[in-house]
Amino acid sequence: NKSCGRYVCFIDDDDVIAPNYLIKIISALSSNADVITFCGDYVENNLRTPFSISMVHRGNFNHPNMFYRLPNHLCPVKREIALSCQFTDKNYGEDSDYAEKINNYIKNEFHIQDKLYFYMYDSNTSQTKPNNTLNAFN
């Protein structure tokens, strides 16, 4: 609610962004798309699985060597969409709830094919369980 920019996104404090993340995202904002999507790696126990976040996937699903996801909290989304789809007041599954809501409003995207985000899963610190179908990546 306190944001003042045209777009809103979340970077989890235990994840890593690519050195060119800001340059690529800021350049993409001129497209005026509802959401900026990108690729990255899901990292668990030093094993990396590539992922792609895009509207073209039409759902969240896993292949043995690739995760496909719809736009979610990691993607810059227009502020007015984010405000109409606020996070629910809970600390488990709130990101999945938000993703489901924003995908009802998003009409177009600007996709960056580069790996910009590295989702660092640690079973010792994460509240997300590996077999949870609501998780952003599992």
Predicted feature descriptions by range:
Residues 58-77:
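A recurrent flexible, glycine/aromatic-enriched loop bordering the glycosyltransferase active site
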Residues 1, 99-100:
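Short, conserved alpha-helix that lines the donor NDP-sugar binding/gating region
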Residues 8:
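Short aromatic/hydrophobic "clamp" motif used to bind/position activated sugar donors
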